[in-house]
C-alpha cells in the first residue's frame, strides 16, 4: 500500500518537509516512489504537484493526516471530485 506522507529534510531547528509517495512499510527517511511536493512550516510555503497527487489518490494511495490537511487547503480534493464527476457524465 502506498501513502502520501511527509519526509523531513533541512537542518536542525529548520525543518523542511518533502511530500512523497512512499510504501507503508518504509521508514520516514526511506526511499520514496516519487516526490510530489514540499512544505515549509516556518515560511508557510507549500508546493504541490497536483496531477501526480491525483494520480496516486486515484490508484488508492492514502494521505496521512497532515498531508490530507495541506492538500485540502490547496483544493486537491475539489479537483479529485471534479475529475470523478466528469468521468460519470
From Swiss-Prot:
Keyword Plastid applies: yes
GO biological process, any: mitochondrial translation
UniProt cross-references to InterPro entries, sorted A to Z: Ribosomal_bS16, Ribosomal_bS16_CS, Ribosomal_bS16_dom_sf
TM helices/strands, residue ranges: none
SUPFAM superfamilies linked to this entry: Ribosomal protein S16 (SSF54565)
Any one GO molecular function term: structural constituent of ribosome
GO cellular component: chloroplast; mitochondrion; small ribosomal subunit
Protein name: Small ribosomal subunit protein bS16c
Organism per entry: Morus indica
